[in-house]
Amino acid sequence: MAAEREPPPLGDGKPTDFEELEDGEDLFTSTVSTLESSPSSPDPASFLAEDISTNSNGPKPAEVALDDDREDLFAEATEEVSLDSPEREPILSSETSPAVTPVTPTTLIAPRIESKSMSAPVIFDRSRDEIEEEANGDVFDIEIGVSDPEKVGDGMNAYMAYRVTTKTSLSMFSKSEFSVKRRFSDFLGLHSKLASKYLHVGYIVPPAPEKSIVGMTKVKVGKEDSSSTEFVEKRRAALERYLQRTVKHPTLLQDPDLRQFLESSELPRAVNTQALSGAGILRMVNKAADAVNKMTIKMNESDAWFEEKQQQFENQDQQLRKLHASVEALVCHRKELSANTAAFAKSAAMLGNSEDHTALSRALSQLAEVEEKIDQLHQEQAFADFYMFSELLSDYIRLIAAVKGVFDHRVKCWQKWEDAQITLLKKRETEAKMMVANKPDKIQQAKNEIREWEAKVQQGERDFEQISKTIRKEVGRFEKERVKDFKTVIIKYLESLVQTQQQLIKYWEAFLPEAKAIA
């Protein structure tokens, strides 16, 4: 009988649920009592761990056969108790007795997770962004403004000149503030120089505003009217945004042509910028040739990142164009609404003048005044729709075209490398034929050509790796700037919408007593 009451050997049996629960309760009670009996012990965590290890490794069968879940539960409780250090006192002091609640140990773990996720990552990300901006040279103390458009000359020889004002504390410039006069062709010439230097090596060069033959012809030969003034203002704002994006680029800012454009009082006349000149026609032919080459050259893309980004920019280009068309339609509808509101205000005023009833006549006159104010609000909102939102979309449609152009130059670089490899293979085949034909005079020439093309292959590989590395960096910088620009513009645009609606409410609330006063 005594042998039957002996515990089974280690691992040969399992305790009953009642025995397991009872031992588990004793185990946890011992832990709590240990904490309460020695609150001022120098190392409560180690003391508790020793207590638990003694109980769990003893000869008791129930403690040996504890399941994994219960051991993990106690381990978490032990881990939480070990956090009771001087650094964690403010967190644990807010709760009355966190260690006395063994049934819900997750309540002890949750504050620790929340405190980490709420404070550390935010501070780390912000400081990391600041460090990256400083390291990449994205923060520059330079302000660019384009103002004072002025018509110079008469007839078809006339052109618009703009004042470019620069304020900076950078040591590369001779003065802290200076301004120069530039015509539109000077901006196009600057972009052409920068693109020829940096586009083929992987740098994203912000595109200059496009020429408008119709708009500029109206400015040259026509009288000053609202359409001409609007065209000049659009171009001025576009030129200002172009320069601001250009000087934000750390590499382009160091370029001597850009510094000359900003500082020099006189610039050599920019040539080959006319749309209908020989150079303009040549550019159109080159674009057509590039389009054909793009269709014929198929690069076996081995980098998934480039393949993904190309698809991403294709989709963004399509969606931006759709949104831009929608915003332009919205601007047209707002202008139409403004015109109809003005017509309504005029009709209401005329009806009020012909009305014999005094109160009704006064109310109609007040209604006409309110509608005139609302007409002005619609004009201002259409202005905000265009200059805040539509122009941003238009800029980024051209910027994404520049990004896609950089990807095309990478394909050209790969094609050049591939052609060099094919030529090298042919040269080696020629050498083998010469050796078989036993022509020693031509063998040496073939070897020299092989060495030459081996160097070209190595150079092509280096160029391809370098442009790929540069594009990765440039795309990261571009996407960061894109998010910043869209965030800033969307906030300003929403603020303008809210302000417009609030002003509308004020106008109608002020008119409501007049309408109620009609008797």
From Swiss-Prot:
Source species, domain of life: Eukaryota
What the entry says about domains is:
The BAR domain is able to sense membrane curvature upon dimerization. Membrane remodeling seems to implicate insertion of a N-terminal amphipathic helix (AH) in the membrane.
Report the GO molecular function annotations.
phosphatidylinositol binding
**Gene3D superfamilies with a match to the protein in the record:** Arfaptin homology (AH) domain/BAR domain, Phox-like domain
Task: Show the segment(s) annotated as Interaction with RhoG.
Answer: 260-519
Where does this protein hold a 1,2-diacyl-sn-glycero-3-phospho-(1D-myo-inositol-3-phosphate)? R183, S185, K211, R235
Q: What is this protein called?
A: Sorting nexin-2
Identify the species of origin: Bos taurus
Q: Does the keyword Protein transport apply?
A: yes
Its GO CC terms are:
cytosol; early endosome membrane; endosome; endosome membrane; lamellipodium; retromer complex
Which InterPro entries does the entry link to? AH/BAR_dom_sf, PX_dom, PX_dom_sf, SNX2_PX, Sorting_nexin_N, Vps5_C
A Gene Ontology biological process annotation? lamellipodium morphogenesis
PTM N6-acetyllysine: list the residues. Answer: K469
Q: Where is the composition biased (Low complexity)?
A: 30-44, 93-103
BAR domain location is: 299-519
In what residue span(s) does the PX domain sit? Answer: 140-269
State what this protein does.
Involved in several stages of intracellular trafficking. Interacts with membranes containing phosphatidylinositol 3-phosphate (PtdIns(3P)) or phosphatidylinositol 3,5-bisphosphate (PtdIns(3,5)P2). Acts in part as component of the retromer membrane-deforming SNX-BAR subcomplex. The SNX-BAR retromer mediates retrograde transport of cargo proteins from endosomes to the trans-Golgi network (TGN) and is involved in endosome-to-plasma membrane transport for cargo protein recycling.
Which residues does the record list as Phosphoserine (modified residue)?
A: S97, S117, S119, S185, S277
Topology class, membrane: Peripheral membrane protein
Residues modified as Phosphothreonine are T101, T104
The UniProt subunit note reads as follows: Predominantly forms heterodimers with BAR domain-containing sorting nexins SNX5, SNX6 and SNX32; can self-associate to form homodimers. The heterodimers are proposed to self-assemble into helical arrays on the membrane to stabilize and expand local membrane curvature underlying endosomal tubule formation.
